[in-house]
From Swiss-Prot:
Pathway: Steroid metabolism; cholesterol metabolism. Its main location: mitochondrion. This is Steroidogenic acute regulatory protein, mitochondrial. Plays a key role in steroid hormone synthesis by enhancing the metabolism of cholesterol into pregnenolone. Mediates the transfer of cholesterol from the outer mitochondrial membrane to the inner mitochondrial membrane where it is cleaved to pregnenolone. May interact with TSPO. Residues 65-278 form the START domain. Highly expressed in the testis and at lower levels in the ovary, kidney and head. It is found in: Mitochondrion. Residues 1-61 form a transit peptide.
């Protein structure tokens, strides 16, 4: 029997977790169903690009042996991607929160069962592959360039696409929102020229709640990166963010903090890429 900790990881039955191939197949069928909905009239061009060039289902399913707990994490990551795609394909109901002179646009909407979610859209000067390498391969270095993050630590890797992370956020100016920590399952995919980094909160035996931090909840979240239609050397960057910061914080404060956090993140990412920090670190290793 799975420990209670892992039963909380995903709302799936023990019998379903016994077969990894079936589990991944069912999750991918669900993703394929979402992509099918996006292929009709008015579908966004980037989803059509994914389907045309290299769909999420195009690669063969590797025969990998995972523990039951690891299977649970893999399914959670795939579920985060599936839910995020479903949210992003629905263009109705988004309200503008921020529109900056640098091109960042943050929008929000309220979803049943999830709450308020935020979507940032911007075009970045860097190539998609370079951004993916920085955000995925150099994930643990994020605290070096993003002052809103104190630490990112990879607790466990499962195959090539799934990992469990522990992240500590910094307090906001004036300590309006104190330090939070998160335990997330992350699911990273590169399909054709489009890259995904999806995630959601989970539990891990190696990281119980920590003294001095409020354990916040995250997800579904997803960063989608693809070459710009106007210039393939630039990247169309879309970030879906859903957070429950916990604690007694007014909603107006939460909304302001989260939308501004997205804009700040993009600006810090620009600075990081311009400095070549991630590339320099890779060469030094």
């Amino acid at each position: 029997m799975l420990p209670a900790t892992f039963k909380l990881c995903a709302g799936i039955s023990y019998r379903h977790m016994r077969n990894m191939t079936g589990l991944r197949k069912n999750a991918m069928i669900a993703i394929h169903h979402e992509l099918n909905k996006l292929s009709g009239p008015g579908a966004s061009t980037w989803i059509n690009h994914i389907r045309r060039r290299s769909s999420l289902l195009s690669s063969p399913i590797a025969e990998e042996t995972y523990s039951e707990a690891d299977q649970c994490y893999v399914q959670q990551g795939q579920e985060a991607l599936q839910k995020s795609i479903s949210i992003l394909e629905d263009q109705d109901g988004w309200q503008t929160e921020i529109e900056s002179i640098n091109g960042e646009k943050v929008m929000s909407k309220v979803l049943p069962g999830i709450g308020k979610v935020f979507k940032l859209e911007v075009t970045l000067e860097q190539q998609t592959g370079d951004l993916y390498d920085e955000l995925v391969d150099n994930m643990e270095q994020m605290g070096e360039w993003n002052p809103n993050v104190k630490q990112v630590k990879i607790l466990q890797k499962i195959g090539q696409e799934t990992m469990i992370t522990h992240e500590i956020s910094a307090e906001t100016p004036g300590n309006v929102v104190g330090p939070r920590d998160f335990v997330n399952v992350r699911h990273a995919k590169r399909r054709g020229s489009t890259c995904f980094l999806a995630g959601m909160s989970t539990q891990h035996p190696g990281m119980p709640e920590q003294k001095g931090f409020v354990r916040a909840e995250n997800g579904p979240t997803c960063i989608v990166m693809r070459p710009s239609a106007d210039d393939p050397n630039k990247t169309k960057f879309t970030w879906l963010l859903s957070l429950d910061l916990k604690g007694w914080i007014p909603k107006t404060v939460i909304n302001r903090v989260l939308s501004q956090t997205q804009v700040d993140f993009v600006n810090h990412l620009r600075d990081r890429m311009a400095s070549g920090g991630g590339i320099d670190a890779a060469i030094a290793c």
